[in-house]
Amino acid sequence: MDIAARNPLLYDNVIYSLHFYAGTHGMELRNRAEQAMKEGLPVMVSEFGLSRADGDGGVFLKECDEWLEWMEINKLSWVNWSFCDVDESSAALLPGAAEKGDWNCCSPSGVWLKSCLRRLNAIFISL
């Protein structure tokens, strides 16, 4: 992002994508993104996970809470990786979860995500 901020695309309707994994990326990446936003780049978090970048290694709740707070402060849209039942830490569903839904099949990552969505939805609805 910092590189893009020094030489931004000169087109209308452009947004820059930020990917992070809470177990791998931290303050250094947030600082680079903040600098890019200060320089005028529009940013969206188009992929993030609660795990390491390889999709595994456990769920890093404290780090994800820090990232979520940062995204809220900076009013960034975000998309979580991944809504699947693969046997890895980043998956929101437990292996073998029902295809048609059953929010009781959430992995630790999914439990955190579900809680965030409920909290943020309650804030949005109360506006």
Where are these regions (language model features)?
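Extracellular glycoside hydrolase catalytic/binding regions
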Residues: 1-77, 92-112
